[in-house]
């Protein structure tokens, strides 16, 4: 069994990098070049000729030396030429237009505004221009009525050109939501009419006032970083979870990164991954809203703690189904070059059918993370190599899974509770992890005992050396998982029994 999970060794027969040699004809060509016979000029020789040089002896010798070296590297034949890559065409400039008396005034991008306005001669005065209709743009979904200035404003303080510049900056911002206007509200209503949350197109998610079309049915969880609510569209039937992230980071690039992440996550189609429907922002509150699949069975953390209050514990059979589902979800992500990086009981969810799925994963890490307890941006479930700042792979998720299952089985977090505080330094946590020995103890007084294969599974997950830790796909072949796959467990009945005593629950 040990050989099955041992990382494969290198199959290379030559451990050293082979020495590369030039062909004979290139060597002869290099020798002739070193003798001063420069038949072809190197592409770098002209680049290194500075326009500020005084043709000194040192500059000439340096250029000659670089030419000979570059000829040795690039001059494969006397007729070979190096083609320059074509320069991509520039982006079309932003054009703002206004018509008055049949004349259309066009203004290019912000880099040319000052020059264009200095050369602009029209037959209307500044105040006549201000008293005219608001400027219209060819950009869709942008309200530019704010460009119209107050007549009492001095021309030198906030002039018409500077107002156009602000309009250009607004139109090129990284926001994904269109500003609120009557036309946009009508357009948004048309886009969502007769559709449910999982049927909305990308254009509908670009409207920040989409939240006005959402009805909140209850609060699923709250924290300092945001909240999760049970929701439904006003004209829809499908219940979904709406996650609100309160962030003070209004950087467009930061929000673009999250949007790219969610767009990528929407493409995932797996029975073990929570489905993402869409995302929109509220610029006034700097909040990010993420709509995702509703999981009525709640999180694994809430489940095992609820049973613990009632004097119960999750059985090994149920833990086996949880481990299998998580490993299959991680394997699916691994096939798409994605590392979850935040496996813990709060991010493993169950629905009312007993299906187990993963949520809250992405490239931005803490940008879309859960509301769980973290310290200085580092999770208690983080693998040793990540805390040390070393390169890590998908096996870091296996470590987190082992720690999660150990917590669920034991009914408490595996580390000694008296040593854990929210403000613990990373070096102290690393010391605890490296000196930590997993202990899955039997509890005869509660009639709880664990199999040897389950203990072995935990041991492999918690290998401190990442090179000895198996991948999720390899862990699916562990004898304990293989044995659990053969056992039938009614997970729907388990979820119903777990929460049957809740009368006012959501």
Swiss-Prot record:
Residues 26-52 have a biased composition (Polar residues). It catalyses: L-seryl-[protein] + ATP = O-phospho-L-seryl-[protein] + ADP + H(+); L-threonyl-[protein] + ATP = O-phospho-L-threonyl-[protein] + ADP + H(+); L-tyrosyl-[protein] + ATP = O-phospho-L-tyrosyl-[protein] + ADP + H(+). One of its GO terms (cellular component) is cellular bud tip. Residues 53-69 have a biased composition (Low complexity). Residues 214-481 form the Protein kinase domain. One of its GO terms (molecular function) is ATP binding. The active site is at 342 (proton acceptor). Keywords: ATP-binding, Kinase, Nucleotide-binding, Serine/threonine-protein kinase, Transferase, Tyrosine-protein kinase. ATP binds at residues 220-228, 243. Its EC number is 2.7.12.2. Signal peptide: none annotated. It is an enzyme of class 2 (transferase). Present with 1950 molecules/cell in log phase SD medium. Serine/threonine protein kinase involved in a signal transduction pathway that plays a role in yeast cell morphogenesis and cell growth. This pathway seems to start by SMP3; then involves the kinase PKC1 that may act on the BCK1 kinase that then phosphorylates MKK1 and MKK2 which themselves phosphorylate the MPK1 kinase. Belongs to the protein kinase superfamily. STE Ser/Thr protein kinase family. MAP kinase kinase subfamily. This is MAP kinase kinase MKK2/SSP33. It comes from Saccharomyces cerevisiae (strain ATCC 204508 / S288c) (Baker's yeast). The gene is MKK2.
């Amino acid at each position: 069994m040990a050989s099955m999970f041992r990382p494969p060794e290198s199959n290379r027969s030559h451990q050293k990098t082979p020495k590369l040699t030039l062909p004979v004809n290139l060597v002869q060509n290099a020798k002739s070049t070193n003798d001063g016979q420069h038949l072809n000029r190197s592409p770098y020789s002209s680049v290194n000729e500075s326009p500020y040089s005084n043709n000194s002896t040192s500059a000439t010798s340096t250029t000659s030396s670089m030419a000979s070296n570059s000829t040795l590297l690039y001059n494969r034949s006397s007729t070979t030429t190096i083609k320059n890559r074509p320069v991509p065409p520039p982006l079309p400039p932003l054009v703002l237009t206004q018509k008055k008396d049949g004349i259309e005034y066009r203004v290019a991008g912000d880099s040319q505004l000052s020059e264009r306005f200095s050369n602009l001669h029209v037959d209307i005065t500044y105040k006549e221009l201000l008293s005219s209709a608001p400027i219209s743009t060819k950009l869709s979904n942008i309200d530019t009525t704010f460009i119209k200035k107050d007549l009492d404003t001095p021309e030198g303080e906030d002039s018409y050109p500077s107002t156009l510049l602000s309009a250009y900056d607004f139109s090129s911002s990284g926001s994904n939501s269109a500003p609120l206007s009557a036309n946009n509200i009508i357009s948004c209503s048309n886009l969502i009419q007769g559709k449910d949350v999982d049927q909305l197109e990308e254009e509908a998610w670009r409207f920040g006032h989409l939240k006005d079309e959402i009805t909140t049915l209850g609060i699923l969880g709250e924290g300092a970083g945001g909240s999760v609510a049970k929701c439904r569209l006003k004209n829809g039937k499908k219940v979904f979870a709406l996650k609100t992230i309160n962030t003070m980071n209004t950087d467009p690039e930061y929000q673009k990164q999250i949007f790219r992440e969610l767009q990528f996550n929407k493409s995932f189609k797996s029975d073990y991954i929570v489905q993402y429907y869409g995302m929109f922002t509220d610029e006034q509150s700097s909040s990010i809203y993420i709509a995702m699949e509703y999981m009525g069975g709640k999180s694994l953390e809430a489940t095992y703690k609820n049973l613990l209050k009632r004097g119960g514990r999750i059985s090994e059979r149920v833990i086996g189904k949880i481990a299998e589902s998580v490993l299959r979800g991680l394997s699916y992500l691994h096939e798409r070059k994605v590392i979850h990086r935040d496996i813990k009981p709060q991010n493993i969810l169950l629905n009312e059918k007993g299906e187990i799925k993963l949520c809250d994963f992405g490239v931005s890490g803490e940008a879309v993370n859960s509301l769980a307890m973290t310290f200085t941006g580092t999770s208690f479930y983080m693998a040793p190599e990540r805390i040390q700042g070393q390169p890590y792979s998908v096996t870091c998720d296996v470590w987190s899974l082992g720690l999660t299952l150990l917590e669920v089985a034991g009914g408490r977090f595996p580390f000694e509770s008296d040593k854990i505080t929210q403000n613990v330094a990373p070096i102290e946590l690393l010391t605890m992890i490296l000196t930590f020995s997993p202990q899955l103890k039997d509890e005869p007084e509660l009639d709880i005992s664990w199999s040897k294969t389950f203990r072995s599974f935990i041991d492999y997950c918690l290998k401190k050396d990442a090179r000895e830790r198996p991948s999720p796909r390899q862990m699916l072949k562990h004898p304990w998982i293989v044995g659990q796959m053969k056992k039938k467990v009614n997970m729907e009945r388990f979820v119903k029994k777990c929460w049957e005593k809740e009368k006012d629950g959501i």
